[in-house]
Amino acid sequence: MTGMRGLSVFISDVRNCQNKEAERLRVDKELGNIRTCFKNEKVLTPYKKKKYVWKMLYIHMLGYDVDFGHMEAVSLISAPKYPEKQVGYIVTSCLLNENHDFLKLAINTVRNDIIGRNETFQCLALTLVGNIGGRDFAESLAPDVQKLLISSSCRPLVRKKAALCLLRLFRKNPDAVNVDGWADRMAQLLDERDLGVLTSSTSLLVALVSNNHEAYSSCLPKCVKILERLARNQDVPQEYTYYGIPSPWLQVKAMRALQYFPTIEDPSTRKALFEVLQRILMGTDVVKNVNKNNASHAVLFEALSLVMHLDAEKEMMSQCVALLGKFISVREPNIRYLGLENMTRMLMVTDVQDIIKKHQSQIITSLKDPDISIRRRALDLLYGMCDVSNAKDIVEELLQYLSTAEFSMREELSLKAAILAEKFAPDLSWYVDVILQLIDKAGDFVSDDIWFRVVQFVTNNEDLQPYAASKAREYMDKIAIHETMVKVSAYILGEYGHLLARQPGCSASELFSILHEKLPTVSTPTIPILLSTYAKLLMHAQPPDPELQKKVWAVFKKYESCIDVEIQQRAVEYFELSKKGPAFMDVLAEMPKFPERQSSLIKKAENVEDTADQSAIKLRAQQQPSNAIVLADPQPVNGAPPPLKVPILSGSTDPESVARSLSHPNGTLSNIDPQTPSPDLLSDLLGPLAIEAPPGAVSYEQHGPVGAEGVPDEIDGSAIVPVEEQTNTVELIGNIAERFHALCLKDSGVLYEDPHIQIGIKAEWRGHHGRLVLFMGNKNTSPLTSVQALILPPAHLRLDLSPVPDTIPPRAQVQSPLEVMNIRPSRDVAVLDFSYKFGTNVVSAKLRIPATLNKFLQPLQLTSEEFFPQWRAISGPPLKLQEVVRGVRPLALPEMANLFNSFHVTICPGLDPNPNNLVASTTFYSETTGAMLCLARIETDPADRTQLRLTVGSGDPTLTFELKEFIKEQLITIPMGSRALVPAAGPAPSPAVQPPSPAALADDPGAMLAGLL
């Protein structure tokens, strides 16, 4: 930019502007001048073009949109001289992104610079690609960049940039780096003596092993040697020593790469690595220099992560915990934070919790730290390390801290205290005390789920009921109590207040008086609960109390004209019921026991924001036997729970619905009787009128379909888990069958998802060949192990699935390409037998791969001159088949045309003289048939849309039959998954036509492809 007077003047003018408006006017004026000059190419010299492009970059840096001149910037890249080429590369990398169309024009020029002999030009090109290179660059330039990286004639500066450039290209297109042969070259790069090249190569290695660690197993001992070299400070230049620490960046990268490999089996390599880790653990201390502290602790905490990954001996684990205990007591807040965070991660390791408990007092002290982020980490750590032995101490500390905690933390704090009290309660009375204290101290932050839960425990444990009623009576004596306390106390006293009748101040009349004092202070949603309690107290008054009856009736009559419909209805109905005598007692009988169910509080805690390493807590919960309170005398989940009101459970009793439920949709899973979520019975307290019925009078539909022996057959929404390894079941996210049917119509999307993993698919189809990529993403901060994926192919497909890594690292995604070759026509599909292990929980599922018959169809629109000669050329059966199809889902002709187009059978409009008919054409590709033309005619009856005549013809009899059956399956309402998952050889028989079911139509979002299998 030296000597560019116009550029200097423009920058000075902008800086001298007095306000934003003046600056904008000056910029607009300059943009207009640049636009005019670019239009007149005859006077646009290379110098002027360079100057104007610099001005555009400066304007862009000021925050203004520059939507022209991009071509001029790109054209400078091809300039023969360095000054112009430098400007072109810099401005292009700043103004354009990887998806810009102009960038494609520069690919050849960039490639010429990369393969050229000018190292300066090579550096410019590699820098551009490393910053904004996309998929197109990856496909075109990856081999050339690889050659530069392994070239012995290139200077280290170029090779460093080549490594980082290749890293960018790999991230944009993992297929750009071919594993075959490159793994050995990668291992050779790790022998590099130049630390700059070695650091860049290690960054590349981290990305490569995260995608496929097995292919790069030869790099594992090389990473250990790098750590040995750095730990001994051998051959480390001064410029790579940071505050006395040999290349901390390279140490961190090498240890991170090692965490993607399984446990090291070679004894000598393992011994050498542990010696290095021991040296790091022993040699790190807190010093006053901030920069040295940051570097040394970055290395240390990465070493701790590696120690946990390697499942080191207990002695080293104890040393790690002791070191972290030292860090959480230092004055530097950043180190305290990292110490607490890593100690929380240590909870994932077995046999370490008892060692962490030794630092419990210091962790509790961190709850009072001025820094809120440290307090949050301390809360997470206390929550994770709690068990039966220390639950009382930790919960009491949390209750004390609740009074002084920030409002932003109180909801999370109360939720975790409630969960710990429930899971590790030594006795139920202590649990009731804790929950009532929570409500008393932080009522605004206690969700309804918490007091619903305590009511369930009290209801299900008769021995607890008198104690809970007496505690509720004590809290009602307080002058000011929270409304949530009024709710829970009113409910408990209404149900069990009569158990205190012999105690002073606990008669029905006295309980009514003390509760009625709170009525003016509560909001509208609480009044219905109080009205229900008044009715219960009136019923339990023995002998009948005329004075109490008079007071209660007065309240009911007062609210008979309430504007709130719920309150009005309760008041009217309770008033009338209270006149019925014995019938009143039958209707308001004592609440029966609730069914046993999994606590919703734990699931809610997992969704709390800003918590560290919830996965550690979940993993430990899976590895240890549960200490949670068990509800007394539980009822079956799918049985008849005794609610406050009679809910209508979703279900269908018609035979077709049952058949559809019994069929196996995508992701068919074994019957392990999962905990089916049941309706929240207590939430009905705040909903419509809650009138109890005797347990025997309430009938319920079962949640799932009924098997042959009348047992609920829960086959959907859970996962195959071997009984000996199962600790709990996973709850699927989304409907797997719907996901599969959606992928039958599109080429990318999610195939399967649960709380731990998401499996997505992206596909490309060309003729009889398909290329799919399975994306498996670990959603947790803990690795998924024992990952296995096996393809069960049908006879008509040839499939080749790339190996899936045994371990998916935390928060990482791995990809596994799948090549599909269609040999002959068939409607059978391949099945992916997928399994993984999270902690000790093994999850397995069989997932249908959306490589369906329609994927090998290519849309083809024919004119009448092309269609009818081909149609007449196809003789009768078996090349041309005709069938009257009944039980068709009634569709208008445009809807039917859209349905056909969606699976690549193209409607040819205007060819059939009858406007109620459709004709269609498509091309089918397979290895045996080649490109085969397929024709179809659909004759509909306007008077009866539930039947039609379907004619399909092609040059191959098997193709004709399979395509006819495929189209018929799309038109008929067939229970999903009625075909077998494992395909049988030979053509499948025609499915039986079934009449349409309104329930099926309403419940089947994937109706277009219903019954594809």
Curated annotation (Swiss-Prot):
Tagged with keyword Repeat: yes
Segments for region (Disordered): 652-676
Protein name: AP-2 complex subunit alpha-2
Sequence segments annotated as region (Required for AP180 binding): 760-1013
Keyword check for Cytoplasm: no
Primary location class: membrane
Its job: Subunit of the adaptor protein complex 2 (AP-2). Adaptor protein complexes function in protein transport via transport vesicles in different membrane traffic pathways. Adaptor protein complexes are vesicle coat components and appear to be involved in cargo selection and vesicle formation. AP-2 is involved in clathrin-dependent endocytosis in which cargo proteins are incorporated into vesicles surrounded by clathrin (clathrin-coated vesicles, CCVs) which are destined for fusion with the early endosome. The complex binds polyphosphoinositides.
Protein topology in the membrane: Peripheral membrane protein
GO biological process annotation, one example: intracellular protein transport
HEAT repeats: 254-289, 354-391, 393-430, 521-565
Species for this entry: Arabidopsis thaliana (Mouse-ear cress)
Gene: ALPHAC-AD
Organism domain of life: Eukaryota
Keyword terms, alphabetized: Coated pit, Endocytosis, Lipid-binding, Membrane, Protein transport, Repeat, Transport
Family stated for the protein in its record: Belongs to the adaptor complexes large subunit family.
Localization of this protein: Membrane, Coated pit
Any Gene Ontology CC annotation: plastid
